[in-house]
Regions:
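An N-terminal assembly and electron-transfer interface module characteristic of large anaerobic redox
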Residues: 1-181
Length: 181
C-alpha cells in the first residue's frame, strides 16, 4: 500500500509556480518586456530554489526514516509531468492535483503494482477527472482499479466492490508477481 505524501503536494505547488514563472519569462522575452522579465526571473530563482531545497530535505528525511520503516519515496514532480507528456494523457497546464494522481498511477503500473485504488472525497472534481482518465487506461493495461468516493453515507455494494477488487489484485499478483521482485 502506497499513499502520496503531503510533501508531494507541497513540491507540486512550488513546481507549478516555477512552471508559471518559466512560461512568463518566455513570453516576456518574446515581447521584449524587460520589467516583466526581471520579475519572472526572480520568481524562477525563488520557486526553483524552494523546490530544490524541499526535494533535498525530503530525500534526507526519507533516507533516515526508510532505515526504520518501509517507506515508498515520492515521485519527482518534473518526472510526473514527463510521464503525462509521454503518454499524452493530461496537461500540467490545466492545474489541480489530477496531474499528480494520473501520472502517479501510471508510474505505479510501470513499477509493477498489482492494483490501484483512487480514494477521494465525494464530488472532488480533480479526482473525478482522474477517474475519467485512469479507469479506461487501467482497463486497457489490464490492471485492477477501484474508485472509492467517500462522503458520510453508506454506499450499497461497497463491500462487494472491494472484495472484487481484492480478488482481481490477487489474480494479477499470481499472474505477474510482486512489484520490485
Amino acid at each position: 500500500v502506497v499513499n502520496a505524501s503531503v510533501a508531494e503536494w507541497i513540491n507540486y505547488t512550488s513546481y507549478d509556480r516555477y512552471r508559471l514563472a518559466k512560461t512568463g519569462l518566455r513570453l516576456s522575452l518574446k515581447q521584449f518586456r524587460l520589467d516583466r522579465m526581471k520579475g519572472y526571473l526572480e520568481d524562477l530563482f525563488r520557486y526553483g530554489g524552494d523546490l530544490f531545497y524541499q526535494e533535498h530535505k525530503q530525500r534526507q528525511v526519507y533516507k533516515r526514516v526508510s532505515a526504520l520503516i518501509d517507506l515508498a519515496g515520492d515521485h519527482k514532480i518534473s518526472h510526473l509531468e514527463d510521464v503525462l507528456m509521454e503518454e499524452d494523457l493530461y496537461s500540467f497546464d490545466l492545474g489541480t492535483e489530477a496531474c499528480l494522481s494520473i501520472a502517479g498511477m501510471v508510474e505505479y503500473v510501470r513499477e509493477g503494482y498489482n492494483g490501484l485504488v483512487n480514494v477521494y472525497p465525494f464530488t472532488c472534481m480533480p479526482s473525478i477527472t482522474t477517474s475519467a482518465i485512469v479507469r479506461p487506461l487501467m482497463n486497457r493495461l489490464r490492471v485492477p482499479y477501484l474508485d472509492a468516493a467517500y462522503d458520510s453515507s453508506t454506499q450499497p455494494g461497497r463491500e462487494a466492490a472491494i472484495r472484487t477488487f481484492m480478488y482481481q489484485a490477487d489474480q494479477h499478483f499470481k499472474r505477474y508477481g510482486r512489484h520490485g521482485s
